């Protein structure tokens, strides 16, 4: 594995670790009342930084590869994901609620989010490899979440989320 591939895999590992821990536990500065906005902003931040870092790494790897060879290397699942994003784009353009369809109103499930899901799928499918330590990170985050939930059920307010 060359240096660029290792860098891309490391960047993917960091992104996955943050999504499996910090993103799951993030409540934002305003408590539960604005948790959706806080999580969405964190999702955008982590994902855009990851995409930029992965793109820089990928550009170093594919500089010398012919475009035809790249197209032949696309897997069927990747074509399907690209088709899904393209259909979502077409649906957004043809929607009578086009202005709302870009971000997706209050739940933020619009074209931007769907396109980022597609990009994440494509990048992680190519750059990430399964690792046991990522399960440990996820397990630790979920254990902490469960402990906080039990504390709250017992009447505590450990994170100061309630007024």
Predicted segment positions?
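Structural signature of hydrophobic alpha-helical transmembrane segments
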Residues: 44, 107-114
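Membrane-interfacial helix-loop-helix modules of multi-pass inner-membrane proteins that assemble, modify
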Residues: 92-101, 144-163
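Transmembrane signal-anchor hairpin modules in multi-pass inner-membrane enzymes, especially those
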Residues: 1-96, 101-105, 119, 123-140
